[in-house]
A protein has these predicted regions:
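PLP-dependent amino-acid enzyme catalytic core
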Residues: 1-216
Length: 216
C-alpha cells in the first residue's frame, strides 16, 4: 500500500510552492474521467501545447487526450487495432497509444502516481528536496517532466549509451543529468549511482520505479 502518513510542515511548503507557481494538482478521478476537469482548466489548455512545460498539462496525464499537438481537449481513449492480416490470429488485439501523452510517453502517468502522494502528504518537499529518477528511458523522461510541472527539481539518471536526443531534452527539463556506464541493458549501474547519491546527499528522494507502488 502507498504510505499516506502526513508531514504537516512539509505539506505547508508544498502548498506554498503550488500557490507561487500557479500549480493545480489534478485528482486521479479527473485523470480517469476528464469530463470532471473544470471548464476554467479546459479553457487554459486551448492555448497550451501538449509538450509545453506548463502546470496545466498535469491535467493531460490521461489516455483520453484529443490527438492534436496543441490546444486539444479530451475525448475517447487513443488506441489502434492491429488487423488479423498483420498478427496472424483471429483475436482482436488493441494497442493503447502513448503518443498523445505529454512527452509522447505514457510514463508521465506512472511518475505522477509516484510523486503526487508524497507531495500532498508532505513526504516530499519541493522546496528543499530533489526528485531522483533512475531509468533507462521513458520513466526518467516522464519523471523529470512531471516534476517540472509540479515545481520540483529533478536528477535524471540514465545510461550514457541512450540517444543524444534524450540527453538534450533532459538537460532542458531536469536540473541535473547523470550518465552511467553502458546502454539500456546496464540497469545495475543506474542503481549503483542511486546508492552513491544516498550516501553523499541528504536533499534527495529516489523514486525507484521497481519499488514504487504508484508505478503499478
Amino acid at each position: 500500500m502507498i504510505d499516506l502518513t502526513p508531514n504537516p510542515e512539509q505539506m505547508r511548503d508544498s502548498a506554498r510552492r503550488c500557490a507561487e507557481e500557479g500549480i493545480v494538482v489534478p485528482t486521479f478521478a479527473q485523470m480517469k474521467d476528464p469530463s470532471l476537469v473544470p471548464q476554467s482548466v479546459r479553457d487554459e489548455l486551448r492555448e497550451i501545447g501538449l509538450w509545453d512545460v506548463h502546470p496545466r498539462n498535469l491535467f493531460r496525464i490521461t489516455w483520453k487526450n484529443e490527438p492534436i499537438p496543441r490546444g486539444g481537449g479530451f475525448g475517447g481513449v487513443n488506441y489502434v487495432e492491429l488487423p488479423s492480416s498483420l498478427t496472424g490470429v483471429d483475436a482482436r488485439i488493441i494497442a493503447l497509444v502513448g503518443k498523445w501523452f505529454p512527452t509522447g510517453a505514457h510514463k508521465v502517468g506512472a511518475t505522477f502516481g509516484c510523486i503526487a502522494p508524497r507531495l500532498v502528504t508532505g513526504q516530499f518537499n519541493p522546496v528543499t528536496q530533489k526528485a531522483v529518477w533512475p531509468s533507462t528511458g521513458n520513466y526518467c523522461r516522464g519523471g523529470a517532466y512531471v516534476a517540472a510541472l509540479l515545481g520540483c527539481e529533478s536528477i535524471a539518471i540514465l545510461p550514457e549509451g541512450m540517444s543524444r536526443e534524450r540527453f538534450e531534452w533532459l538537460e532542458r527539463v531536469a536540473g541535473e543529468v547523470i550518465a552511467t556506464p553502458g546502454c539500456e541493458s546496464n540497469v545495475k549501474e543506474i542503481f549503483d549511482k542511486c546508492w552513491e547519491l544516498r550516501a553523499t546527499r541528504e536533499d534527495i528522494v529516489i523514486f525507484n520505479q521497481f519499488e514504487e507502488f504508484g508505478n503499478h
